A protein has these predicted regions:
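Short, mixed-charge, low-aromatic patches
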Residues: 16-25, 54-65
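Hydrophobic alpha-helical membrane segments
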Residues: 51-54, 58, 71, 75-78, ...
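Hydrophobic/aromatic-rich core segments of domains that either
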Residues: 108-205
């Protein structure tokens, strides 16, 4: 994550940043891509509209697509296609190492700017099947604090809420479990898609077992 320049050390949420984007397989080449203020404002608006962790992951999928499109205006990565075979030998092609590394850098920038409310960014994950290995960026769901102005819960409701089973305005017998829970991890994998398309988001356990589109 070191090759992120301007990661908001001064606390300026939307100041321009430079992210090193890997390409040509195995991060053989890197291009310095400038993320401008208007793009960061747009990203912030998209992410802050997310009401929960699931919505934030869907937003991150779209945000990564936009960042890769931005990178294509400053580097040859617009030539990248899903998997490895469709763009073999093409300048700007990206394998899973390029995508996992670059996506993690994009996500780390957003995290450093305080734009992620429901997730934290982890190191890339690796899966191995037979003699092949594959990498992806990963995020983890954060524990959520109750709103400051939320009414106090009755003891029974509080106990249920601690296990994600109830809210103060829902009777315990009708409460639904949240779509995701704190500590759950998800792969955000842009290698599966053509350049500029939303990244594939999968539970990490499913991804580790070989989940995802059938591309090569």
């Amino acid at each position: 994550m070191v090759p992120v320049v301007g990661a908001d050390s001064a606390g300026v949420r939307h100041s321009p940043a430079v992210v090193m984007v890997c390409h040509n397989y195995g991060c053989a080449k890197q291009a310095a891509v400038r993320v401008d203020t208007s793009t960061l404002w747009w990203i912030d608006d998209v992410l802050q509209a997310s009401a929960d962790a699931a919505a934030e992951r869907e937003a991150l999928s779209r945000v990564l697509a936009q960042l890769y499109r931005l990178a294509a205006r400053q580097s040859p990565v617009g030539n990248d296609r899903a998997g490895n075979f469709l763009d073999d030998g093409v300048e700007g092609r990206m394998d899973c190492i390029d995508h996992a590394t670059t996506s993690t850098r994009w996500l780390a920038l957003l995290e450093a700017r305080g734009m992620l409310r429901f997730h934290r960014v982890l190191e890339p994950a690796r899966r191995t099947r037979f003699i092949l290995q594959h990498f992806s960026a990963v995020v983890e769901v954060l524990a959520q604090e109750p709103a400051a102005d939320a009414p106090a819960l009755e003891p029974a409701m509080l106990a249920a809420a601690e296990h994600g089973a109830a809210r103060y305005d829902v009777a315990p017998e009708h409460a639904q479990a949240p779509a995701t829970v704190a500590g759950e991890r998800f792969a955000i994998d842009a290698w599966f898609v053509d350049h500029g398309e939303p990244a594939v988001v999968l539970p990490l356990d499913e991804w580790l077992k070989g989940g995802g589109p059938n591309v090569h």
